[in-house]
Swiss-Prot record:
Belongs to the peptidase T1B family. It catalyses: Cleavage of peptide bonds with very broad specificity. Keywords: Autocatalytic cleavage, Cytoplasm, Hydrolase, Protease, Proteasome, Threonine protease, Zymogen. GO terms for biological process: proteasomal protein catabolic process. The formation of the proteasomal ATPase PAN-20S proteasome complex, via the docking of the C-termini of PAN into the intersubunit pockets in the alpha-rings, triggers opening of the gate for substrate entry. Interconversion between the open-gate and close-gate conformations leads to a dynamic regulation of the 20S proteasome proteolysis activity. The lineage of its organism: Archaea, Methanobacteriati, Methanobacteriota, Methanomada group, Methanopyri. The active site is at T11 (nucleophile). The gene is psmB. Residues 1-10 form a propeptide. Its EC number is 3.4.25.1. Pfam families: Proteasome (PF00227). This is Proteasome subunit beta. The 20S proteasome core is composed of 14 alpha and 14 beta subunits that assemble into four stacked heptameric rings, resulting in a barrel-shaped structure. The two inner rings, each composed of seven catalytic beta subunits, are sandwiched by two outer rings, each composed of seven alpha subunits. The catalytic chamber with the active sites is on the inside of the barrel. Has a gated structure, the ends of the cylinder being occluded by the N-termini of the alpha-subunits. Is capped at one or both ends by the proteasome regulatory ATPase, PAN. One of its GO terms (molecular function) is threonine-type endopeptidase activity.
Length: 210
């Protein structure tokens, strides 16, 4: 399907599983064809205190999916008196993506869902068909081949959160330097049991980029 090519025209997002949580990172550039459409575009979103999601692809479709995820998370909490797990939410959105594809109205997005299943951190990659894969590390967008080069070389199972942050920043930075669809700096989010969803301060990220 020709529209799915849009998923590779801009953006680099990265997710890494660490010993005590999850790290999500993304650039801030939005492109439209060969034009830069935005330089401060949000690509990492809080769903609740212990789940975050990165988006690559159509900005409009991404916002619809994020709104749906937030609504489903709130509804689940009201019904069950506890927060939805990352696995349950990823499975739920997988069904939505698959159903939209079968109806020939696909959501042109690829997602990385990071968060917790009870006390265990987890990371999932979802594509527009609804395919869902649990990962130790993953990347999406046009800069993902470059980012994967860093991830595959530097990821270590059980690595600390601080080390995972550094690797995530280096992975996106490598795409900033080589992919024209990626640019305008890096946003980094950590999700831990102790602090929940936390976006790193700009100055902290800048130190890692320098």
């Amino acid at each position: 399907m020709k529209e799915l090519d849009q998923l590779t025209k801009g953006t680099t997002t990265v997710g890494i599983l660490a010993d005590k949580g999850v790290v999500l990172a993304a650039d801030r550039r939005a492109v439209m064809g060969n034009l830069i459409a935005g330089k401060q575009v949000k690509k990492i979103f809080r769903i609740h205190d212990y789940i975050g999601v990165t988006t690559a692809g159509s900005v409009a479709d991404a916002q619809k999916i994020v709104d749906l995820m937030r609504a489903e998370a709130r509804l689940y909490e009201l019904r069950h008196n506890r927060m939805i797990s990352a696995r349950a939410l990823a499975n739920m959105i997988s069904h939505v993506l698959h159903s939209s594809l079968k109806a020939f109205r696909p959501y042109l997005v690829q997602l990385i869902v990071g968060g917790f299943n009870d006390d265990d951190p987890a990371l999932y990659n979802l594509d527009p068909s609804g395919s869902i894969i649990e990962e130790d590390y993953t990347a999406t967008g046009s800069g993902s081949p470059t980012a994967y080069g860093v991830l595959e070389a530097e990821y270590e199972e059980g690595m600390s959160l601080d080390d995972a942050i550094e690797v995530a920043v280096r992975a996106v930075k490598s795409a900033l330097e080589r992919d024209t669809g990626t640019g305008e700096g890096v946003t980094v989010v950590t999700i831990t049991r102790e602090e929940g969803y936390r976006e790193l301060p700009e100055e902290e990220v800048e130190k890692l980029l320098s």
